[in-house]
């Protein structure tokens, strides 16, 4: 279920503009008519070692997009448009690396693009007086790296780069060891401890991204 996350970044594409050649692979994006900043929310890149049964990249990407859509201050490119651009990015181009000149060509007609990298998602059993700590509650440690580029100039400019870290209490009956975690997609997921933890993470990330984009639009 997780193989698509790596293939997204492994496909090749040169997005240097429109070409009339038969072999052109440029993605044409119609310029939106809007006064809001035009933003791409790239799919979350998962480098964690979680043991969840679903695609956490899909889940977190959707949650961040939903939050920003609710805020209503940014114009987000559709998921289909984002996928069309992202899945063709040249192999080896890392948005968290030192060489990022390709970002402007890779995301044409965008004013900003936000990248996310899940670097930690671990459930740690809490120590207790019980002989087997796995029978008790746990602490969920999550870390997400975010990097936002301003693409309005000649070269992409990083306007936000940080790691958001959070810890959340998971009651014993909802820990991974109890095999009772409500999966993403279940109607009860949003009110489960794991669902609430993910929502709080995405809420903070969405707020940070929006704040920095709007701040740079005023400067």
Could you say what each language-model-derived stretch is?
Residues 12, 33, 106-110:
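Alpha-helix termination/capping residues and helix-transition junctions
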Residues 123-129:
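Extracytoplasmic/secreted cell-surface and envelope-processing proteins
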Residues 1-8:
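Bacterial N-terminal signal peptides that target proteins for export
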Residues 8-16:
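Bacterial N-terminal signal peptides
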Residues 38, 47-120, 147-161, 204, ...:
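N-terminal segment of the mature soluble domain
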Residues 18-35, 123, 136, 141-219:
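C-terminal/domain-edge helix-coil "capping" segments
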Residues 130-134:
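Extracellular loop and loop/strand-boundary signature of outer-membrane beta-barrel proteins
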Residues 27-49:
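Post-signal peptide N-terminal segment of mature Sec-exported envelope proteins
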